[in-house]
C-alpha cells in the first residue's frame, strides 16, 4: 500500500505526469499547470490538436508508438524521475484502467497515481467554486456562465468539458478568486469538489456502471450537496427536477417556461438573433 500526503505534494508541486493527457478534462488541468510554471509531462495514444497545443505551450507528450521497453529512452527517464519525489504528482484520466502499462509502472515503483477529479479538487480548493452539475447541459451552462462573468467584470477561471469558441480553450484563466467547474457525477468524481454554489441542471438515469439505479444516482447528488453543507451559500435547481433540498434555506429554481426564482425571456428577430432578458 502506498502511503502519501498528496496535499503536501500539491503545495510544493513542480512537475506532473498526466496519463491520458489528450482527454478534454485532463488537458485542461495540464494547461493550468503550464500557466502556473509547473512542468508537464504526459502520455496519450496519438497526437491530436489538443496534445499538439499542449506541446506548443511547453508540455512534453509521449505517444503509444514510443515504446516503454527501450532502455534509457527519454520517456523511460521521465517516468524514473517521478520515483521518490515529494514535489511531483501523477494524474490519470477515467479512461485509463489499472492495467495500463504506465499505471502499472508507477504502481510497481510505489508512485501514487491520483484521479483527474482529485487533482481538480486540489486546484479548486484555493478558489470560491461554482459547480455546474447534472446529467446533461454541464458544458453549455459552464461555458455560458464563464462568459457572462467575464463580460460582467468578474475575471473568473474555468475548467470546461469542451473547447469554448469564445476562449478557444477548455481552460479559461482569470485573476479573480472565482472558479467555474463542471461537477461530473461519473465515477462519483464530484465528491472531490468543495463548492460554494451548486447548480443541478438535470437528473436522468445515466452511467449504469457507477449507478445501477436512478435512486443510486439521486443519492450521490444528495451526498454531493450535503457533504458541502458548511461551504454552500446557495443551491440552484432547474424547475421540476427530480430532486429537492427542503432542509436548505438558500435553494433557488430557474426556468425558461413558467415562473421561477430565475427566469429567462427571449425574443427572436428577423435576422435570427435573440434578445435575452
Residue spans for each PLM region:
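Phosphate-binding loop of NTP-binding sites
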Residues: 4-9, 18, 32-35, 56, ...
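Short coil/loop residues immediately preceding or within conserved phosphate-binding loops
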Residues: 13, 127-129, 273
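Glycine-rich adenosine-cofactor-binding loop
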Residues: 17-30
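Short N-terminal binding/cap micro-motifs at the start of the first secondary-structure element
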Residues: 25-28, 49, 166-167
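NAD(P)-binding Rossmann-fold cofactor-contacting core
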Residues: 39-53, 156
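General small-molecule cofactor/ligand-binding pocket signal
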Residues: 41, 60-62, 114, 252-255
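Short, conserved SAM-binding/catalytic segment
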Residues: 53-60
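Acidic-glycine-rich active-site phosphate/pyrophosphate-binding loop
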Residues: 260-277
Amino acid at each position: 500500500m502506498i502511503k502519501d500526503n498528496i496535499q503536501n505534494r500539491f503545495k510544493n508541486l513542480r512537475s506532473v505526469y498526466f496519463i491520458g493527457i489528450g482527454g478534454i478534462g485532463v488537458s485542461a488541468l495540464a494547461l493550468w499547470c503550464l500557466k502556473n510554471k509547473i512542468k508537464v509531462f504526459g502520455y496519450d495514444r496519438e497526437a491530436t490538436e489538443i496534445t499538439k497545443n499542449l506541446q506548443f505551450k511547453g508540455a512534453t507528450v509521449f505517444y503509444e508508438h514510443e515504446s516503454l521497453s527501450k532502455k534509457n529512452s527519454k520517456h523511460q527517464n521521465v517516468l524514473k524521475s517521478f520515483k521518490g519525489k515529494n514535489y511531483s504528482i501523477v494524474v490519470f484520466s477515467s479512461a485509463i484502467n489499472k492495467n495500463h502499462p504506465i499505471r502499472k509502472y508507477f504502481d510497481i515503483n510505489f508512485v501514487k497515481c491520483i484521479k483527474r477529479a482529485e487533482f481538480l479538487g486540489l486546484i479548486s480548493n484555493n478558489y470560491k467554486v461554482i459547480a455546474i452539475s447534472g446529467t446533461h447541459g454541464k458544458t453549455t451552462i459552464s461555458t455560458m456562465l464563464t462568459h457572462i462573468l467575464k463580460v460582467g467584470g468578474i475575471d473568473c477561471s474555468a475548467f470546461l468539458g469542451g473547447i469554448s469558441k469564445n476562449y478557444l480553450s477548455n481552460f479559461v484563466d482569470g485573476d479573480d478568486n472565482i472558479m467555474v467547474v463542471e461537477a461530473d457525477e461519473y465515477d462519483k468524481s464530484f465528491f472531490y469538489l468543495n463548492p460554494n454554489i451548486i447548480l443541478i441542471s438535470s437528473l436522468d438515469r445515466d452511467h449504469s456502471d457507477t449507478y445501477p439505479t436512478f435512486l443510486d444516482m439521486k443519492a450521490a447528488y444528495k451526498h454531493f450537496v450535503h457533504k458541502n453543507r458548511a461551504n454552500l451559500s446557495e443551491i440552484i435547481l432547474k424547475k421540476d427536477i427530480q430532486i429537492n433540498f427542503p432542509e436548505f434555506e438558500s435553494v433557488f429554481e430557474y426556468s425558461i417556461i413558467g415562473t421561477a426564482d430565475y427566469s429567462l425571456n427571449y425574443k427572436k428577430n428577423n435576422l435570427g438573433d435573440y434578445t435575452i432578458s
